[in-house]
Swiss-Prot record:
GO terms for cellular component: cytosol. Its EC number is 4.3.2.1. It comes from Archaeoglobus fulgidus (strain ATCC 49558 / DSM 4304 / JCM 9628 / NBRC 100126 / VC-16). It catalyses: 2-(N(omega)-L-arginino)succinate = fumarate + L-arginine. This is Argininosuccinate lyase.
Amino acid sequence: MLRESRMKKGMDPKALKLSSSIEHDKNIFLYDILVDVAHVLTLKKGGYLSEEEAKEIILALKKVKDSGFREDWPYEDVHEAIEAEVTKITPHGAKMHTGRSRNDEVATCLRMFARDHLLNLAEAILNALDVLIKKAEKSHFLMPGFTHLQYAQPTRLSHHLLAYHDMLSRDFERAIEAFRRVNKSPLGSAAFASTGYSLDRVYAARLLGFDGVVEHSEDAVASRDFVIESIFVAAEAMLSISRIAEEIVLFSSEFGFITLPDEFSSTSSIMPQKKNPDIAELLRANAGKIAGNLTSAMMIYKATPFSYNRDFQEMNPLLYESLKRTHLAVEVFASMMGKIKFNPEITERKASKGFATATELADMLVMKYGVPFRMAHRIVGRLAAKELERPTASDVNSAAKELGVEINVRDEDVLEALDVEKVVENRGNLGGTSKAEVERMIKARKSDLKDRKTLLRKLRGEVKMGLKMLYDEAKKLGVDINV
C-alpha cells in the first residue's frame, strides 16, 4: 500500500517475510486501534477533520476492531493493515494518517503495551508477596540456614520466607518505577521532527491515559530505553523467582524440607515412583530465557544512530514475550508456593546440623569470658576441625589451651550456646530471627502490602480515566468503541 508511488517494483518475497512484523503485531492490535481513535479525535480538535469524517473513520475502526486481528493480512505490519482496512470501509480513511508517522504511532503502541503489562506484573508480584506473608505467619518453626549451600546458622522458616518476600518486593518497586517512565506519550512527534499541523499532543496523551508526553519529538521516536528497562524489570523478577525455584527443587529432594503439590509436579515416563519438580525447574529455566531477551534487546539497540531505525522492530517481540512470560511465571510461582507443604519435623531436626551453633559459641566466649572475637573464632574452629558438633565445656577449654588461652568455661554456658531455639531467639536486633522481630516484620509488610495495592488501583484508575475520556469523545460522535 505504501510502496506504490515511490517504488517501481514490489518487495522481494523473502525480504518481505523478513521485514514483516504481522506475526507479533497481534500484541498491539487493540492498542493501535485506540491510538488511531485518539489521533482522529486530535485531528478533529485541530480542525483537520470534520465531525462527520471523524465519525466515519472511528466507525470503520470499530468494524476493524470487531472483526479482530488477522495473521493472514497481506500487509507489512498491523499499522498498515488497519489503515488499509479502514480505507476500504470509508474513503476518509486516507486522512487518518494526517500529521502522523508510523514512528510515533508504533512507539505509542509499545508504551501502552508496556505500561499495562508492567502493572499486570506488579499485581502478580503483590499476589506472590501476599502468599509469602501468609506462609510466614504460620511458619515460625526452625530450619537450617545456608551459606555456600552448606549448613551455616539456624533460622526460622518465617524469617527465610520474608527474605523471599523482600527480594520480590523490590521487583514490585522496579515495575512501578518503570511504569512511571513508560507512561508518557510520543504521539504527535511524527517521523521525528514534529509536524506542521497544529495538533494538541497533551490532549492526545490524556485520551490514551498517559500522564504526560515525551516532550522532545526526536527523543520520542528514537528512544527504546523504555523497552530495555521493561525487559530488565521482567528479567530481574525472573532472577528472583529462579533463586526461590532452585531452593524448591533442592528442598523437595534430599533435604526433605517441603512436599510439592501434585498440581505442580510430574512423573517419569519410565520410573513410576518419581515425583519431579518440573514446574520449579521451568521457572528456573525461564529466567535464562528472559535474561537472554534483555541481552538481545541491548545488542540490537546499541550504536543505533538517531532517530528511528528499523532495527527497533526486532526488539518488540522480546518485549512482548518478556512481560507476558514473566507475568505467567510469577502467577504460577504464587499458586505453587501457596500449596507447598513444609515439613517442620525435618527442618527442626536439621537446624543444628553442621555445627550450626558455632557462631553462637564463639560469641559466648566473647561476651561472657572476654575472649577477643578472632581468638574465639579460632577456638571454635579448632573444635569444628575435630568434628565436635556438640562439644563439652572441657572440649572448649582444651581447644583454648592448645591455642595458648587459659579459660574455664562452664557447662551451662556451653549448653545454652548449643541450644538452637535460644540461638535463634537471641537474635532480636532489627531484621533478626527472634520470633518477636519476625512478627514485627510481618506486620510491617502486611501494612506495606495494603498500601501497594492501593497504589496499584490508583495507577490503573488513572489510565482508565484517560481512556474513558476517549470513549466519551467517541460516543459524542455516536460511536461506542470501548476496547
